[in-house]
Amino acid sequence: MHTRVLHVLEFDKVKEQLLEHVSSSLGKEKVEKLFPSSHFAEVTNWQEETDEAVAALRLRGHVPLGGIFDIRASLKRAKIGGTLSPHELLDIASTISASRQLKQFIESLHEEKEEFPHLAGYAEKLAALPEVQQAIERCIDDHGEVMDHASERLRSIRQQLRTTEARVREKLENIIRSQSAQKMLSDAIITIRNDRYVIPVKQEYRGVYGGIVHDQSASGATLFIEPQAVVELNNQLQEARVKEKREIERILTELTSIVAEHAEALLENVDILAQLDFIFAKAKYANKLKATKPVMNDRGYIRLLQARHPLIDQDVVVPNDIELGKDYTTIVITGPNTGGKTVTLKTIGLLTLMAQAGLFIPALDGSELAVFRSVYADIGDEQSIEQSLSTFSSHMVNIVDILRNVDHESLVLFDELGAGTDPQEGAALAIAILDEVHGRGARTVATTHYPELKAYGYNRDGVINASVEFDTETLRPTYKLLIGIPGRSNAFEISKRLGLDERIIERAKSHISAESNKVENMIASLEQSKKRAEEEEKKAKEARMEAEKLRSDWEQKWEELHEKRDEIIEEAKRKAADIVRASQQEAERIIRELRRMQKEKQAEIKEHELIEAKKRLEEAIPTLEKKKKERKKQTQHAFQPGDEVKVTSLNQKGYLVEKVSDDEWQVQLGILKMKINERDLEYIGSAPKTETKPLATVKGKDYHVGLELDLRGERYEDAIVRLEKYIDDALLAGYPRVSIIHGKGTGALRKGVQEFLKKHRSVKNFHFGEANEGGTGVTIVELK
């Protein structure tokens, strides 16, 4: 794959867009080195990695990629015995923390129904190293300062520093507050020069305080003097600072040695974090482009469905269907310039490069692309000024280079093949070049405005004509690719609409041969027929999709019904078995009691004892028949509006509102009203005497309960009180799922909300919202 081709097809601009989605300098480095692969297995592997990352983002909405630093240089210095600075150590601790969070995030994905083998493989290799992180964070604060409790000696030294410093300031405060200070000092302040405390003394009073002059003002009128009274204390202060510096150096050396012990594991972590950042950047870019995973093949087959050029505004770009490599291996796109032919050419080439780099492509799901050994492109005016070559010559240099290497594993893109020279010779050359490339088995797309190449598409096996549609009403290209129809100039139609005299147009037509006119008319007719066929196909496709959707919905409902039925039958069997088992046990106990009484050889078993035993035996007989009769009796109940019922399929209680048909009732379930078949209803109780009260009672509680609760700006305690009440109200309202808006901010409120939800007995599950629901600023709660 030549770098010149990547530049011509603007792959570098795709990389620039991809860079916007990386989270670290490590990921940026990966993107900058991104290069399409020519190996099928490698491309397939890259695509699967991107697919897993897209699925993870879809399920979780975000991925923890913050706090990753490029610590490779620091690790190398630690390995050779250098001492790391506090900020370098903090970056290492942060990167370890990021590794752990990302590892936990990926491992938690096993809770989902989907598989993530590639991501799980990376996560498994990430070393947690909590002892290294803890050692660093125990000694260094967030600002990169070594803390007092990093060691007992450092604590003691700093205590001495504070005490001595306080004594120095106290002595100097006494000096500057004295009555004589007003005339002797330039200003009543204490300042520092050369790390020693001094006071600003006027030049004429320099001998009053004794001590050492450390500095003077620009004018020389003020001297910064360390009074003799604090010289000794300042000396003690300096000694303490030296001790502090040595102790800090010792602590940093100790921490560096801990890092050095785990340098290899940390370097491997860095490589994995870089790869994961890069993979998730590809996934985020795919989401931005609304791109899909292409099906990759090694047969040279391309099938793009509604493909869009990724660098054109997605609101205005015209999607196209493109197929190559099955019935035909060469497409010749004819028609006038500025008709969108080059955009189509670049779309095919750029999407191929993106797919071979592991990126999703902006096309519909089901699109297919081949892995080519090489992609060649001769596009645009790239004449060499240094070589003083003409446009034709510069193109020919590229074409000669292409012909030197092209084979059946190549994709070749020619823009305006044969242009820049005599039209007749140019067309002949174009045909000969296409024949050569086609004969070698390469997949080829060529654009040209030579009419001679229209016939070429009809006369060669495996070659097809194409054109970009032109709207003669608006005098603009629609940029829609028409496979199977050659292009035409539309010069006469455009001239007529722009006001050129009809006589001139007719005279111009007379200069064109009858054969050419016949071909142009045939092309126009083909365009109209194809347009009508596409419209009919679109309608048929929409109807088929609607039918398939309905079928899918009904199949799902049928499956759910069968699952529910099987569950009910299993539950009934289990209960029946329990009843039979209990009855048998009771019967056996009674029989054992009778036998015991007989064994005791009582003179006579009293009649009332036999009657009592027989009665208990009869009571122990399973009551299934009785239950069946009760069930039958219930189903035969004449339902009335207001009756309390149970909807068996939903396992929910409600009230009958009105009968809507012979076998269907409207049922009030919480705040919902649903139409339920009478067979699905189980009678519980009759309507109360008071009119409509049951409905009012059900409706009253949840009348104003919304599907979301906004806690932004609330104090933590108030927010939790509101949240607890809201969850209770939502449960009474029968909501299966609600949203809690807590915002992003510092994360304190979010953490508090989620801690509360973890402990709530009625919360089934919760997770952050999707990107379009508010992301990490919203928690979605599923209720039991």
From Swiss-Prot:
Coiled-coil region(s): none
SUPFAM superfamilies: DNA repair protein MutS, domain III, P-loop containing nucleoside triphosphate hydrolases, SMR domain-like
Keyword field: ATP-binding, DNA-binding, Endonuclease, Hydrolase, Nuclease, Nucleotide-binding, RNA-binding, rRNA-binding
Gene3D superfamilies, sorted: 1.10.1420.10, 3.30.1370.110, P-loop containing nucleotide triphosphate hydrolases
InterPro entries for the chain: DNA_mismatch_repair_MutS_C (IPR000432), DNA_mismatch_repair_MutS_core (IPR007696), DNA_mismatch_repair_MutS_sf (IPR036187), MSSS (IPR046893), MutS (IPR045076), MutS2 (IPR005747), P-loop_NTPase (IPR027417), Smr_dom (IPR002625)
Keyword set includes Hydrolase: yes
Enzyme class label: hydrolase
Limits of the Smr domain: 709-784
GO biological process: mismatch repair; negative regulation of DNA recombination; rescue of stalled ribosome
Residues given in the record as ATP binding sites: 335-342
Keyword DNA-binding: yes
One Gene Ontology term of the molecular function aspect: ATP-dependent DNA damage sensor activity
EC number: 3.1.-.-, 3.6.4.-
Xref: Pfam families: MSSS, MutS_V, Smr
SMART domains: MUTSac, MUTSd, SMR
Protein task: Endonuclease that is involved in the suppression of homologous recombination and thus may have a key role in the control of bacterial genetic diversity.
Family: Belongs to the DNA mismatch repair MutS family. MutS2 subfamily.
PANTHER family according to UniProt: OS10G0509000 PROTEIN, OS10G0509000 PROTEIN-RELATED
Subunit note: Homodimer. Binds to stalled ribosomes, contacting rRNA.
Protein name: Endonuclease MutS2
Organism: Geobacillus sp. (strain WCH70)
Classification of source organism: Bacteria, Bacillati, Bacillota, Bacilli, Bacillales
